């Protein structure tokens, strides 16, 4: 690769929870070649073979949503959910979704069995939602958001519980995604605590770097 002007190889292995069989051969090859870990993010994952009970706080939030009559459904209305998601990201983080609503709708149309939207609704109006990417082994929560109303009555907690206990109970893993920024040097402690309240525990997402 030196002949082509390449000076550095950056490799992000697929976390083991997405593999159907053990497949860490590339990691050993990188170690043997002298690669180093340049970044380490931390995700939160539920192992359905060793389910941990929900925390009391999460149970109270779910009970609040149940009392409010919140209902959970699979949905194809990406427009309404994207409005919620965009508002949340802009107001709380000053950012926007990686995908536009048109892009995510297109991806869903091409991979309808692997990309799905679930919403929590109050009087038939979505107030929380999760876009899930499915693999053979794992359900990955790619986008998660709730409106102010949804947050106040525990709609997102109810939706997450619905996905864990009913929709994806047959999957080996349910992955909430990472709670870190800046290559893993910043940990959002409130976010990871919320995920752990549903019984999730840590899985690292590493990045390897090899000088050529």
Regions found by a protein language model. Give the residues of each.
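Short, basic/hydrophobic alpha-helical segments
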Residues: 1-6, 166-167
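A conserved beta-strand-loop-helix scaffold within acyl/acetyltransferase catalytic domains
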Residues: 13-150
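Residue-level detector of family-conserved "landmark" positions at structurally sensitive sites
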Residues: 11, 40, 75, 176-177, ...
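Divalent metal-dependent hydrolysis catalytic cores, especially in the metallo-beta-lactamase
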Residues: 6-14
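Aromatic (often tryptophan-rich) hydrophobic motifs at membrane interfaces
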Residues: 114-212
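Structural alpha-beta junctions
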Residues: 3, 32-38, 198-203
């Amino acid at each position: 690769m030196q002949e082509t002007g390449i000076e550095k190889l950056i490799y992000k292995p697929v976390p083991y929870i997405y593999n159907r069989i053990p497949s860490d051969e590339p990691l050993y090859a990188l170690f043997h070649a002298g690669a180093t870990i340049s970044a380490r993010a931390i995700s939160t994952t539920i192992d359905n073979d060793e389910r941990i009970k929900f925390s009391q706080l999460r149970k109270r939030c779910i009970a609040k949503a149940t009392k409010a009559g919140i209902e959970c459904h699979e949905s194809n209305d990406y427009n309404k959910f994207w409005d919620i998601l965009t508002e949340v990201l802009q107001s709380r983080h000053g950012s926007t979704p990686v995908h536009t609503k048109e892009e995510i709708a297109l991806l869903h149309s091409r991979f309808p069995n692997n990309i799905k939207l679930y919403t929590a609704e109050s009087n038939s109006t979505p107030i929380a939602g999760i876009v899930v990417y499915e693999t053979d082994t794992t359900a990955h929560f790619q986008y998660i958001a709730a409106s102010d109303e949804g947050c106040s009555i525990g709609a997102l907690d109810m939706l997450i519980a619905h996905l864990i206990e009913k929709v994806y109970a047959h999957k080996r893993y349910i992955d909430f995604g990472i709670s870190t920024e800046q290559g893993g040097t910043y940990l959002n402690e409130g976010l990871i605590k919320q995920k752990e309240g549903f019984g999730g525990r840590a899985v690292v997402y590493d990045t390897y770097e090899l000088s050529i």
